[in-house]
Protein backbone atom coordinates (compact mmCIF):
# COMPACT_ATOMS: atom_id res chain seq x y z
CA UNK A 1 0.00 0.00 0.00
CA UNK A 2 2.93 2.35 -0.31
CA UNK A 3 2.29 3.49 -3.89
CA UNK A 4 -0.47 5.67 -5.31
CA UNK A 5 -1.94 2.89 -7.44
CA UNK A 6 -1.96 0.41 -4.56
CA UNK A 7 -3.90 2.89 -2.41
CA UNK A 8 -6.47 3.52 -5.14
CA UNK A 9 -7.15 -0.19 -5.64
CA UNK A 10 -7.67 -0.88 -1.93
CA UNK A 11 -10.68 0.00 0.22
CA UNK A 12 -8.87 -0.23 3.57
CA UNK A 13 -8.57 3.03 5.48
CA UNK A 14 -6.18 1.72 8.12
CA UNK A 15 -3.54 -0.94 8.66
CA UNK A 16 -2.33 -2.07 12.10
CA UNK A 17 -3.89 0.84 13.98
CA UNK A 18 -5.21 0.41 17.50
CA UNK A 19 -8.96 0.42 18.02
CA UNK A 20 -10.35 3.92 18.72
CA UNK A 21 -10.84 4.56 22.43
CA UNK A 22 -11.50 7.27 24.99
CA UNK A 23 -8.49 9.55 25.33
CA UNK A 24 -6.54 9.53 28.58
CA UNK A 25 -2.91 9.82 29.72
CA UNK A 26 -1.51 6.86 31.72
CA UNK A 27 0.40 7.64 34.93
CA UNK A 28 2.73 5.44 36.94
CA UNK A 29 2.15 7.64 39.97
CA UNK A 30 0.93 11.17 40.60
CA UNK A 31 3.02 13.64 38.65
CA UNK A 32 4.78 10.92 36.63
CA UNK A 33 3.04 10.32 33.31
CA UNK A 34 4.09 7.40 31.14
CA UNK A 35 4.50 9.59 28.07
CA UNK A 36 7.33 10.91 25.90
CA UNK A 37 6.71 13.73 23.44
CA UNK A 38 7.91 13.55 19.86
CA UNK A 39 6.92 17.14 19.15
CA UNK A 40 9.73 19.37 17.98
CA UNK A 41 11.98 19.60 14.94
CA UNK A 42 11.82 16.79 12.37
CA UNK A 43 13.76 16.20 9.17
CA UNK A 44 11.49 16.92 6.21
CA UNK A 45 11.38 16.55 2.42
CA UNK A 46 8.47 17.50 0.14
CA UNK A 47 7.82 15.97 -3.28
CA UNK A 48 5.35 17.05 -5.96
CA UNK A 49 3.97 13.53 -6.51
CA UNK A 50 4.35 10.10 -4.95
CA UNK A 51 6.19 8.71 -7.97
CA UNK A 52 9.11 11.10 -7.35
CA UNK A 53 9.98 9.58 -3.97
CA UNK A 54 13.08 7.33 -3.84
CA UNK A 55 12.36 3.72 -2.94
CA UNK A 56 14.62 3.40 0.11
CA UNK A 57 13.76 6.63 1.91
CA UNK A 58 12.86 4.71 5.09
CA UNK A 59 16.34 3.21 5.48
CA UNK A 60 18.60 4.54 8.23
CA UNK A 61 21.43 4.86 5.72
CA UNK A 62 19.39 7.07 3.37
CA UNK A 63 21.12 10.40 2.65
CA UNK A 64 19.16 13.32 4.15
CA UNK A 65 21.75 16.01 3.42
CA UNK A 66 19.36 17.93 1.15
CA UNK A 67 16.38 17.68 3.50
CA UNK A 68 14.86 20.61 5.37
CA UNK A 69 13.66 20.97 8.96
CA UNK A 70 10.04 21.43 10.01
CA UNK A 71 8.33 21.93 13.38
CA UNK A 72 5.87 19.28 14.52
CA UNK A 73 3.01 19.90 14.90
CA UNK A 74 2.48 22.26 11.95
CA UNK A 75 1.12 22.41 8.42
CA UNK A 76 3.76 22.22 5.73
CA UNK A 77 2.04 24.89 3.58
CA UNK A 78 3.43 27.50 6.02
CA UNK A 79 7.00 26.23 5.63
CA UNK A 80 7.26 25.28 1.93
CA UNK A 81 6.25 26.46 -1.53
CA UNK A 82 3.13 24.28 -1.44
CA UNK A 83 -0.02 26.36 -1.08
CA UNK A 84 -3.10 26.29 1.19
CA UNK A 85 -6.50 25.98 -0.48
CA UNK A 86 -9.73 27.47 0.82
CA UNK A 87 -13.00 26.15 -0.58
CA UNK A 88 -16.41 25.03 0.63
CA UNK A 89 -18.46 22.76 -1.65
CA UNK A 90 -16.01 22.79 -4.56
CA UNK A 91 -13.34 20.10 -4.51
CA UNK A 92 -9.78 21.41 -5.04
CA UNK A 93 -9.11 18.72 -7.65
CA UNK A 94 -10.88 16.81 -10.42
CA UNK A 95 -13.68 14.62 -9.03
CA UNK A 96 -12.99 11.00 -9.94
CA UNK A 97 -13.27 8.82 -6.82
CA UNK A 98 -11.36 6.97 -5.55
CA UNK A 99 -8.61 8.43 -7.74
CA UNK A 100 -6.57 11.49 -6.85
CA UNK A 101 -4.64 13.90 -9.11
CA UNK A 102 -1.64 12.23 -10.71
CA UNK A 103 0.11 15.45 -11.79
CA UNK A 104 0.03 17.32 -8.46
CA UNK A 105 -0.60 15.67 -5.10
CA UNK A 106 2.29 16.57 -2.77
CA UNK A 107 3.78 13.90 -0.53
CA UNK A 108 6.06 14.66 2.42
CA UNK A 109 8.64 12.54 4.20
CA UNK A 110 9.25 13.10 7.91
CA UNK A 111 12.06 11.59 9.99
CA UNK A 112 13.35 11.88 13.52
CA UNK A 113 15.30 9.87 16.08
CA UNK A 114 14.52 9.31 19.73
CA UNK A 115 15.80 7.34 22.70
CA UNK A 116 13.32 5.07 24.40
CA UNK A 117 12.69 5.64 28.10
CA UNK A 118 14.72 3.05 30.01
CA UNK A 119 11.99 2.75 32.65
CA UNK A 120 9.60 1.30 30.07
CA UNK A 121 11.21 -2.12 29.92
CA UNK A 122 8.65 -4.96 29.82
CA UNK A 123 5.83 -2.52 29.01
CA UNK A 124 3.73 -2.05 25.89
CA UNK A 125 4.73 1.11 24.00
CA UNK A 126 2.31 2.95 21.71
CA UNK A 127 2.58 6.02 19.52
CA UNK A 128 -0.25 8.55 19.35
CA UNK A 129 -0.78 10.91 16.41
CA UNK A 130 -3.37 13.56 17.27
CA UNK A 131 -4.02 14.30 13.60
CA UNK A 132 -2.16 13.81 10.32
CA UNK A 133 -3.67 15.29 7.17
CA UNK A 134 -4.73 13.47 5.11
CA UNK A 135 -3.18 9.98 5.10
CA UNK A 136 0.13 8.55 6.25
CA UNK A 137 2.39 5.52 6.50
CA UNK A 138 4.73 4.78 9.42
CA UNK A 139 8.07 2.96 9.57
CA UNK A 140 10.16 2.38 12.70
CA UNK A 141 13.75 1.17 12.42
CA UNK A 142 13.23 0.37 8.72
CA UNK A 143 10.17 -1.81 9.40
CA UNK A 144 6.70 -0.96 8.12
CA UNK A 145 4.34 -0.32 11.04
CA UNK A 146 1.04 0.71 9.47
CA UNK A 147 -1.19 3.18 7.64
CA UNK A 148 -4.04 5.51 8.56
CA UNK A 149 -6.29 8.07 6.91
CA UNK A 150 -8.81 10.43 8.49
CA UNK A 151 -7.24 13.84 8.80
CA UNK A 152 -8.87 15.08 12.02
CA UNK A 153 -8.97 11.91 14.10
CA UNK A 154 -6.22 10.35 16.24
CA UNK A 155 -4.32 7.27 15.10
CA UNK A 156 -2.33 4.96 17.38
CA UNK A 157 0.05 2.09 16.70
CA UNK A 158 1.64 -0.48 19.01
CA UNK A 159 5.41 -0.08 18.57
CA UNK A 160 6.52 -2.63 21.16
CA UNK A 161 7.89 -5.15 18.66
CA UNK A 162 9.57 -2.48 16.51
CA UNK A 163 11.63 -0.67 19.15
CA UNK A 164 15.16 -1.31 20.35
CA UNK A 165 17.08 -0.22 23.42
CA UNK A 166 18.69 3.15 22.89
CA UNK A 167 18.23 5.10 19.67
CA UNK A 168 15.27 4.53 17.33
CA UNK A 169 14.26 6.13 14.03
CA UNK A 170 10.70 6.87 12.93
CA UNK A 171 9.71 7.76 9.36
CA UNK A 172 6.38 9.06 8.06
CA UNK A 173 5.16 9.39 4.50
CA UNK A 174 2.25 11.87 4.43
CA UNK A 175 -0.05 12.34 1.43
CA UNK A 176 -1.85 15.64 0.87
CA UNK A 177 -4.97 14.18 -0.78
CA UNK A 178 -6.19 10.60 -0.40
CA UNK A 179 -9.42 8.79 -1.23
CA UNK A 180 -10.58 9.74 2.27
CA UNK A 181 -10.40 13.40 1.25
CA UNK A 182 -13.59 12.88 -0.77
CA UNK A 183 -15.43 12.50 2.56
CA UNK A 184 -14.02 15.74 3.97
CA UNK A 185 -15.62 18.28 1.64
CA UNK A 186 -16.50 20.92 4.23
CA UNK A 187 -16.03 24.67 4.41
CA UNK A 188 -12.44 25.00 5.68
CA UNK A 189 -8.81 25.50 4.71
CA UNK A 190 -7.14 22.52 3.02
CA UNK A 191 -3.83 22.08 4.84
CA UNK A 192 -1.46 19.14 5.25
CA UNK A 193 1.03 17.56 7.58
CA UNK A 194 1.41 16.36 11.16
CA UNK A 195 -0.89 18.99 12.61
CA UNK A 196 -1.46 17.81 16.20
CA UNK A 197 0.69 16.36 18.98
CA UNK A 198 2.77 13.22 18.57
CA UNK A 199 3.84 11.27 21.64
CA UNK A 200 4.78 7.83 22.90
CA UNK A 201 3.08 6.29 25.90
CA UNK A 202 3.64 3.10 27.85
CA UNK A 203 1.24 0.77 29.61
CA UNK A 204 1.60 -2.52 31.49
CA UNK A 205 0.71 -5.57 29.44
CA UNK A 206 -2.51 -5.78 31.47
CA UNK A 207 -4.06 -2.31 31.49
CA UNK A 208 -7.23 -0.32 30.89
CA UNK A 209 -7.47 0.51 27.17
CA UNK A 210 -10.92 2.12 27.08
CA UNK A 211 -13.74 3.29 29.32
CA UNK A 212 -17.25 4.66 28.96
CA UNK A 213 -20.09 6.03 31.09
CA UNK A 214 -23.55 4.50 30.90
CA UNK A 215 -26.47 6.62 32.05
What are the residue ranges of the model-derived segments?
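Single conserved hydrophobic/aromatic residue that forms the stacking wall/gate
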Residues: 1-11
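N-terminal, polar/Ser/Thr-rich
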Residues: 15-18, 24-31, 83-85, 186, ...
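Accessory beta-strand-rich segments of carbohydrate-active enzymes
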Residues: 28, 43-47, 53, 77-81, ...
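Mature N-terminal segment immediately following signal peptide/propeptide cleavage
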Residues: 29-46, 69
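Soluble non-transmembrane domains of integral membrane proteins
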Residues: 37, 61-63, 110, 117
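Short Gly/aromatic-enriched secondary-structure transition segments
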Residues: 53-72
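Surface-exposed acidic, glycine/proline-enriched linker/cap segments
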Residues: 90-98
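Short beta-strand segments of immunoglobulin-like
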Residues: 213-215
